[in-house]
Design a protein with these regions (language model features):
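Clamp-loader machinery-focused feature within the broader ASCE/P-loop NTPase space
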Residues: 2-131
Length: 131
């Protein structure tokens, strides 16, 4: 069950009940959007939700650690790079970027999602991507 963690104090009871009901029913949508102001715990809530989903199909005690370390074979996290770190090269499709504010996600990262999702799940029934 999803619990309110110390660093995630904005997770209100209604959201917690909704996410827990999804887990109980084992009825998942193809995608979820966690939105809100910066610093309210969207990523932490999403990671906790993903951990609970994987716990439904596996009894391994290391799921939480593997999710946190982005080391689960059925989980992929895609994070934007800051514009200062990104290098745009006109010669390579891999370096073309999609801009979003001050951060970018490379096209190669999006292609990686496609490859990842086309492969069979290894440790669970689901494959999950967090962007």
């Amino acid at each position: 069950m999803i619990k309110v963690k110390k660093n995630n104090f904005f997770l209100n009871e209604e959201i917690k009940r909704y996410l827990n009901s999804i887990i109980k029913k084992n009825s998942y949508a193809n995608g979820y959007i966690f939105y809100g102001a910066e610093g309210v715990g969207k990523k932490e809530t999403a990671l906790e939700f993903i951990t609970e989903i994987f716990k439904q199909s596996s009894s391994s005690g290391t799921i939480e650690e593997r999710i946190t370390n982005n080391n689960h074979p059925d989980f992929l996290i895609i994070e934007p790079n800051s514009t200062l770190e990104a290098k745009i090269s006109k010669n390579s499709d891999l370096e073309k970027t999609t801009k979003s504010g001050s951060e970018i996600i490379k096209i190669a990262q999006i292609r990686n999602i496609k490859t990842f999702l086309s492969q069979k799940s290894i440790n669970s029934e689901k494959k999950i991507v967090l962007i």
